Amino acid sequence: MSRQAVGRASAHEACDLVDWPRDATRRLYSDPFVCSHRLHEFEMFSDASLATLIDRFPHERLEVATMVSGRAGWSDWHIVDYRGVSGTDLIAAIRRGSLWARLMRVDLVSQEIADLMRTVYAHILHLTPDLEIIWSQPSILISSARAQVYYHADAFPTMLWHIRGRKRVWTYPLNDETLVSQQALEEIIAGSFCQMAPYREEFDRRAGVFELPEGHLLCWPPHAPHRVENLSDLNVSLTFWYESTISLRRREIYMANRALRKYLRIRRPSTREDGAFPDLKRRAYRLARRLGMLKTGKLDPPTVAHYRIDPSSENGVAPLPGGVQLPFLGNRAIRAESAPYFN
């Protein structure tokens, strides 16, 4: 298939782009799994193409962070001011330092990438029609050879399409209170700041460990804790947040439980997802939300950078005394604008 014609390809013509298992719908919600893909063969993910994309990417959708001190933990995660730096220089700084960049909602900026992902997911949905995706948000991740993303859990299901470089991912069991409590998971799913159990090396004994060379896709159960370390070279991945009918049912149960805990002081509401009572609980939650009876929580705090990009420095960044507020919309605002991706 012509790489230029990917936007016009049918699900059958796209079958060589990803080795998607037919039992994936069941596995997505129970166990991590890896399959191969061919996205790394596309020129749109080269340094030159990514630099051009960065040059025209809206500032409010581009986030850059550094792990400048090398300490393992979120206290070492610092936002970086990238404004006024060309895409070429930003990529050069990422190569030199310990940097992580995320281009959120890349589908709104690059029609080429949007067409590619639409083609790939047409094939995925052809193979697994019971995977009913409601909306999605693809983002490009570009990170340094020694960058890492610390122990955390996500509010939405995620697929990680690894395209360039090598990385190692640890995924941890979901229903383990020593890793993440039920209450913490409720706050994560609600989009509120939440302190998970601090990472300890002993957690790794319960983890699944996956080394990803280019051309591999990793999926793990929604909301399962995980962490990532890059192993070599500049890393490029496409991360795909999405909501399905199954994940929405689970999220609504946890959101309802959060409301029960907060307003009715129920200390440990049930996380059961199937049956008459869970269905009633979900309906009651949706009604209460529609009537404005539930507080939606605070918006993301302003994004303040205390470092700026400096491609000539050893770490790719330089201190920014006093800090500066950036125009980044924030995760919550970007999630709220999600629209159906598959028609």
What are these model-predicted stretches?
Residues 103-140:
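A gly/proline- and charged-residue-enriched helix-loop-helix capping module
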Residues 139-153, 172-176:
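Conserved short histidine dyad/triad with adjacent acidic residue
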Residues 2-118, 257-264, 288-343:
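Transition-metal
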Residues 201-204, 248-291:
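Active-site-adjacent segment of 2-oxoglutarate/Fe(II) JmjC oxygenases
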Residues 182, 232-248:
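A short hydrophobic beta-strand segment most commonly corresponding to one strand
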Residues 162-219, 224-225:
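Double-stranded beta-helix
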Residues 21-23, 88-91, 126-130, 145-152:
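Catalytic micro-motifs at enzyme active sites that drive phosphoryl/nucleotidyl and oxygen chemistry
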Residues 135, 148-158, 205-206:
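A short beta-loop-beta micro-motif enriched in histidine and acidic residues
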